[in-house]
A protein has these predicted regions:
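Specific transmembrane alpha-helical segments of multi-pass solute transporters/efflux pumps
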Residues: 16-21, 50-96, 135, 216-234
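Membrane-interface helix termini and inter-helical loops of multi-pass transporters
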Residues: 22-34, 89, 134-146, 194-212, ...
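Hydrophobic/aromatic residues within transmembrane alpha-helices
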Residues: 27, 37, 41, 87, ...
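Transmembrane alpha-helices of multi-pass small-molecule transport proteins
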Residues: 29-79, 104-110, 157-164, 179-198, ...
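C-terminal transmembrane-helix exit sites in multi-pass transporters
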Residues: 48, 53-54, 103-124, 248-268
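Hydrophobic transmembrane alpha-helices of multi-pass small-molecule transport proteins
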Residues: 49, 118-138, 190, 244, ...
Length: 289
């Protein structure tokens, strides 16, 4: 069971992230802007994360760990969600998520650039995932070039985040402390960005605030921490490929809750992506054995 834990962490993280557009679109209807949503996502998780840190030995962190956490958090919890959430304003959430998922291939290519050992099966799975993701794109849907550019760029910045996470040196702070400081630094940066760009728009109803709190806790304490734990143990390439469960979740959430249709193309794309995910998971277990 312990060997399966990191793989399950990444998959569960992807499923939670896949439900993210539902919460984002609800909060947009409450008057929240994409930049404000990133700010709230990080800010509202801080009290709970601080309490959890106290149970794990406190908030003390070295300067080196803080600098590395700041850089990692900037890409993972600041710039990536700004780009992705902004793309939801121009594209259907499912399509935006699909374009965002250029990053498994980028991570594998990044591994080659960093002269990591890239296994042939990882490269094959990345190509297979890309094929599956392309099939999930609705060719009849309206595609806004700005939305596509935002979503694709979010994939690039997220790939950088995964590579930074996999090579994170100060692993003594992994867990609640790392997540707390990533959220804190991102919240401070986003507050000033929202102020200077006049994008600080908060929920106007109690339901909006409760939704923002639930959104924050699910993402920062649920999905982000699960993804960190899994990536530390199985590496950037496998984590990126397994994360392709996210667009599948987004599409099926849309079918179940947003009255979107299920087509043979979607079924085929989902099946190919799932096969790639299962293949890389089983291959990883054999390597460990």
């Amino acid at each position: 069971m312990e060997r399966r834990t990191p793989w399950l962490c990444v998959i569960l993280s992807a499923v939670i992230f896949g439900c993210m557009p539902l919460g984002a679109n609800f909060l947009y209807a409450q008057g929240v802007t994409p930049m404000s949503l990133v700010f709230l996502r990080n800010l509202l998780s801080l009290p709970v994360l601080a309490l959890l840190c106290q149970k794990q030995g406190g908030l003390r962190i070295s300067r080196g760990a803080l600098l590395e956490t700041s850089l990692t958090g900037f890409f993972g919890c600041c710039i990536t969600p700004i780009l992705l959430f902004s793309s939801y304003c121009y594209l259907a959430s499912g399509m935006a998520t699909v374009f965002h998922f250029a990053y498994p291939v980028i991570v594998v290519l990044g591994g080659l650039v960093l002269r990591e050992r890239v296994q042939k099966k990882a490269l094959f799975c990345a190509v297979l995932c890309s094929l599956g993701i392309l099939l999930l794109i609705d060719p009849s849907g309206a595609v806004d070039p700005l939305g596509v550019a935002l979503a694709l760029t979010s994939g690039v910045t997220y790939a950088v985040y995964i590579l930074l996470l996999a090579h994170f040196r100060h692993r003594e702070v992994m867990g609640f402390r790392m997540t707390f400081y990533m959220a804190l630094i991102s919240a401070v940066c986003m507050f000033f960005l929202c102020l200077f760009s006049h994008q600080l728009c908060l929920p106007q109803t109690l339901a909006g605030w409760l939704a923002a709190l639930a959104f924050s806790l699910m993402i920062c304490i649920g999905a982000v921490m699960l993804f960190q734990k899994g990536t530390f143990l199985i590496g950037a390439q496998r984590a990126a490929i397994l994360s392709t469960f996210e667009p599948i979740t987004s599409i099926f959430v849309g079918i179940l809750f947003l009255n979107e249709t299920l087509t043979p193309r979607i079924l085929l794309g989902s099946a190919i992506t799932l096969v790639a995910g299962v293949f890389i998971t089983l291959g990883g277990k054999k390597d460990e054995e």
